[in-house]
Amino acid sequence: MLERKIRLNAVADVKEFVRAAEKCEYDVDVFYNRVVVDAKSILGVMSLDLTKTLTVKYCKEDEEILEGTL
């Protein structure tokens, strides 16, 4: 699993990120403090505090798909 820090500053950023995550074959998770949500869920991602830096964990195989949005 790879880990990356991201900032999603606008709703458009969230939409773009979730669309990219949906294309991934494996699980993509977003972490903030003790909260973990599925990155393929727009409601889950929107429920996080988007003013903070989030941590994304994903498989090496999906790196190419996500790289453009991270």
Predicted regions, residues:
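N-terminal-biased segments
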Residues: 1-3, 59
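C-terminal structural segments of small proteins and small subunits
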Residues: 46-70
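Conserved beta-strand core positions
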Residues: 4, 26-28, 54
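Amphipathic alpha-helical interaction surfaces in cytosolic regulatory modules
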Residues: 11-27, 35-50
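Positively charged, low-complexity intrinsically disordered leader regions
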Residues: 3-9
